């Protein structure tokens, strides 16, 4: 009886998903770290197991080992939440039970503990498990859902004693390889099945997981494939929860030619004279309003699990371009927070000029801030949004 009462008290202490998101001032992604493939392993492999060197996957893509100093630096810069993308498929000790290597799970727990030591919220997901992400087809649906249920049963049981600050996200960018475009009805149906499987199994593990903040995804984490035509089916949570403890996740690198590929150097109305992208503040706020109207109105939280700006500049305009990037960050964070969304900026520790240069902190140089314009804009956005609270 005492155990039951204690469990109920723990569950009652859990905030809703919308409360959880509203408490995130600014979130950061520990990118290109724990979602790496094992050293020497094909990153697109669907193999499940423990290949040689799997315990060293954390550094397989060139980034140094994460330390408590890594987390401390992120917290000191003003972030109070971290998303930890995790690839599990090369750390499975028993593929039939989808059991996770004790070494790998211990390492993930260690990093979570560091985050909690600094009173940061955490998202843990399944990221780059290619057997799951790259096969959104009916021929794989039943097998994948069974494996996903076993995997999340193991993760949820291992992490179930953590308090409300730790949230679970079911999948990542599920898509047919080399096809980021419009999905088929089959692709969408499989993504919806993944989401329901994830919700069912996490709740079934009981304890804190009954009302833990759980995060489900639109296909390829592109909200356009969930906002229209009933493409996204809101999973059914257990009785008594409604939609209160669930968020929908999307990723936002818009407009891509500015945020992702770096072909366009300016964004926003104040920079129109320099050839700014056609997509602007009105585009962004209109899109955010659609998210709030479609999902927020139904009680769901909204998590922008990834967003960012690749560093790109030209000649003598570098300072003005970086000033413009600060303006974008300020606008993005302020508008998202006004609507209660949580946001997690992507940082892959890559620096340079052009596509995929999303580095903010230099992990190879004691977490020195290399993209100060990003931090500046994010902080200004947080301050701006506070005026509307």
Where are these regions (language model features)?
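Aromatic-rich peripheral "rim/lid" segments of glycoside hydrolase catalytic domains that contact
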Residues: 314-389
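Surface-exposed, active-site-proximal loop segments in enzymatic domains
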Residues: 55, 88-106, 129-144, 176-184, ...
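An active-site-proximal structural segment forming one wall of the substrate-binding cleft
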Residues: 60-82, 92, 96-128, 132-170, ...
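Active-site region of glycoside hydrolase catalytic domains
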Residues: 142-280, 289-310, 338-344
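N-terminal carbohydrate-binding accessory modules
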Residues: 11-81
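Bacterial N-terminal signal peptides
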Residues: 1-8
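Solvent-exposed loop/turn segments at secondary-structure junctions
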Residues: 32-36, 81, 87-92, 128-132, ...
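Catalytic domains of carbohydrate-active enzymes, especially glycoside hydrolases
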Residues: 65-87, 290-298, 333-335, 339-342
């Amino acid at each position: 009886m005492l155990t039951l009462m204690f469990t109920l008290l723990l569950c009652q202490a859990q905030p809703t998903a919308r409360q959880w998101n509203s408490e995130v001032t600014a979130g950061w992604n520990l990118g290109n770290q724990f979602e790496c493939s094992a050293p020497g392993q094909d990153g697109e492999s669907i193999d499940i197991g423990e290949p040689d060197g799997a315990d060293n996957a954390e550094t397989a893509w060139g980034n140094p080992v994460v330390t408590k100093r890594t987390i401390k630096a992120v917290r000191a810069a003003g972030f109070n939440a971290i998303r930890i993308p995790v690839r599990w498929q090369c750390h499975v000790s028993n593929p039939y039970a989808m059991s996770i290597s004790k070494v790998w799970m211990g390492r993930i727990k260690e990093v979570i503990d560091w985050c909690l030591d600094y009173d940061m919220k955490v998202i843990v997901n399944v990221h780059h498990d290619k057997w799951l992400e790259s096969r959104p087809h009916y021929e794989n649906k039943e097998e994948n859902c069974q494996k996903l249920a076993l995997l999340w049963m193991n993760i949820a049981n291992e992490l179930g004693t953590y308090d409300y600050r730790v949230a679970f996200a079911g999948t990542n960018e599920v898509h047919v390889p080399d096809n980021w475009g419009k999905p088929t009805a089959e692709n969408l149906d499989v993504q919806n099945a993944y989401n329901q499987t994830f919700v069912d199994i996490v709740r079934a593990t009981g304890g804190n997981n009954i009302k833990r903040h759980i995060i489900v995804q639109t296909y390829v984490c592109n909200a356009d494939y969930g906002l229209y035509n009933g493409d996204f089916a809101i999973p059914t949570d257990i009785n008594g929860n409604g939609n209160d403890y669930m968020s929908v996740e999307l990723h936002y690198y818009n407009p891509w030619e500015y945020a992702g590929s770096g072909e366009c150097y300016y964004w926003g109305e104040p920079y129109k004279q320099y050839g700014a992208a056609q997509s602007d503040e009105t585009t962004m706020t209109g899109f955010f309003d659609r998210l709030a109207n479609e999902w927020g109105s139904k009680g769901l939280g909204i998590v922008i699990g990834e967003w960012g700006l690749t560093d790109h500049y030209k000649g003598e305009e570098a300072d003005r371009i970086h000033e413009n990037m600060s303006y974008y960050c300020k606008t993005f964070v302020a508008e998202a927070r006004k609507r209660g969304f949580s946001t997690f900026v992507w940082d892959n520790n890559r620096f340079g000029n052009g596509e995929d240069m999303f580095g903010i902190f230099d992990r190879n140089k004691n977490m020195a801030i290399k993209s100060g314009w990003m931090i500046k804009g994010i902080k200004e956005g947080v301050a701006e949004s506070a005026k509307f609270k």
